[in-house]
């Protein structure tokens, strides 16, 4: 169950056994296809992604609040592969009153990043659970966050593509402060109405409010870590740590940098375009 933790702590003499254990959990597919590093929208048509060629094994990177979960979840449904979000794993552990819950609560409330050891532990358990259910492929959201995590992942599986979602800081802060959650069903909404000038001559970025149904309005809560101070602290920590991870995957030719042009209505079709995906084709496919 703690295969990734054992690998994280292991010496070189014992790492091969741990790697073998995690490799089985990850259900590694055929050798990965190289994807040229690029930044949308500068050259969206040069992507060589072919998700139908084999099992999808993708990673989504991006700042807190950028929308990793939203787009990874949509792609998960479209492609029929599990969406594994480390943020959800942490929140599930917090609700469980398990052995890590108190430690995690202190870390989250202070706006700090959860340690490699804890994340690897939670992810290992999730992967083993998925293996038992016959899952194949995955879209990882929020992992890896450090080069060490990326190195561990590389040792045990082939990552086909790493999508790095990007938004300006002002938009990220407003999005995070506008997040609301239904206290009963757990569904996410966003009450922020965003309209800001783009950076470096880019078009304006507009995002409409994602208003909840009237019956849900009185059940909305704000996440404890969605205060302006904590949001800015999270962004600062993320930027300090993310560049080495981006460079790691860029050097392998697997990084796709995607500047979100707006909200879901504007961004989703563009993301499908750079990934060479036809939503209607997948919806009509019996395997979808």
UniProtKB/Swiss-Prot annotation:
Q: Which organism is it from?
A: Solanum tuberosum (Potato)
Q: Subunit comment for this entry?
A: Monomer.
Instruction: List ligand-binding residues for ATP.
Output: 65-70, 179, 262
Provide the catalytic activity annotation: AMP + ATP = 2 ADP
The UniProt family comment states: Belongs to the adenylate kinase family.
Entry annotated with the keyword Cytoplasm: yes
| Chain positions covered by the region annotation LID | 178-226
| Protein keywords | ATP-binding, Cytoplasm, Kinase, Nucleotide-binding, Transferase
Q: What class of enzyme is it?
A: transferase
Q: What does this protein do?
A: Catalyzes the reversible transfer of the terminal phosphate group between ATP and AMP. Plays an important role in cellular energy homeostasis and in adenine nucleotide metabolism.
Which E.C. number(s) belong to this protein? 2.7.4.3
The entry's localization annotation reads: Cytoplasm
Annotated TM spans: none
Q: Output this protein's name.
A: Adenylate kinase
Region annotated NMP, chain positions: 85-114
Q: Which GO terms describe its cellular component?
A: cytoplasm; mitochondrion
Taxonomically, which superkingdom?
A: Eukaryota
Concerning InterPro entries, the annotation shows: Adenyl_kin_sub, Adenylat/UMP-CMP_kin, Adenylat_kinase_CS, P-loop_NTPase
Give the GO molecular function terms.
Answer: adenylate kinase activity; ATP binding
**Where is AMP bound in this sequence?**
86, 91, 112-114, 142-145, 149, 223, 234
